[in-house]
């Protein structure tokens, strides 16, 4: 049995802690034979291989008496880069418990568990459902809406340095002014409506007018300014910080994809430039 979970890009503009999209990088968990103790085989750096691995901790949180197994973990989702690496593991852990424990969890139940563990639904929701998911959590009441993201390209600049979510959150203010809150709310409304209509020009306008988080976090990602400038000059819809950063995401049409990649490559920035596609499916299980 193999469990596959996509990467995600969240905090899309003013969709702070609320809106995320599934993208074409993946965590894969191969479930092998039962064992006397949990073993997670992988080649990742500084990640436990025993029961303390987040994958196993999550699975045991869902069902504490699961029989230990030998597992193989593969992932091309970079760690601490704002592409949902921890969320993918949490979602995989929930699915691992669901499969080994024969729990028959609904998608809604998976989302509730994942949100409780992660603290917010913006990454875990698209990892579960796929595509674009708009979510809200108010006093533990979770609502989510799955919609189709308009056809487009996501060009990711993935820096060679990490930016921990905790560090990125520490630069955020404790409060927003009433004026900024109203402005951000209205911009978020326009962004959602334009995405639903397939109007990426207006959506891009709204994405770049977030007041919730990006203006505080941009100084932590020195490459952001020049990437936005070059991408805008070459016809991108929007440039935004993916998740808590440091990945910088450029949203553009398929036609503009290669010209933008070519121009960004000329900058010789300290990181990788990768074109990602929208993943329409969330977590899935392949039986052998």
UniProtKB/Swiss-Prot annotation:
UniProt-recorded Gene Ontology molecular function terms: ATP binding; homoserine kinase activity
GO biological process per UniProt: threonine biosynthetic process
Keywords: Amino-acid biosynthesis, ATP-binding, Cytoplasm, Kinase, Nucleotide-binding, Threonine biosynthesis, Transferase
CC per GO annotation: cytoplasm
Pfam family, one: GHMP_kinases_C
Catalysed conversion reaction: L-homoserine + ATP = O-phospho-L-homoserine + ADP + H(+)
Entry EC number(s): 2.7.1.39
Involved pathway(s): Amino-acid biosynthesis; L-threonine biosynthesis; L-threonine from L-aspartate: step 4/5
UniProt subcellular location: Cytoplasm
Coiled-coil ranges (or none): none
Binding site for ATP: 78-88
Its biological purpose: Catalyzes the ATP-dependent phosphorylation of L-homoserine to L-homoserine phosphate.
Stated family: Belongs to the GHMP kinase family. Homoserine kinase subfamily.
Record protein name field: Homoserine kinase
